[in-house]
């Protein structure tokens, strides 16, 4: 989950990792909030995900409900305490295992 699935250091750091995950062992859902910049980084992430959900400006509750409905086991929030963060989604506990990583 991130507002930075675009031309941004977060996307540049996670894209190749996501592209090389073993899909026989996991399914990748990416939840984007914030606006798309249409960059090649955004396009690569859209292609790399099994499910790419553009949540736009939806509320924390709506995003948490979608994540829960998708039966996500591990949720990693990539924004931390940066602009556009949605740490409030984690407070709603939409996944049994949750972490905040990479953003500060």
Q: What is each model feature region?
A:
Residues 1-104:
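Conserved nucleotide-cofactor-binding alpha/beta core module
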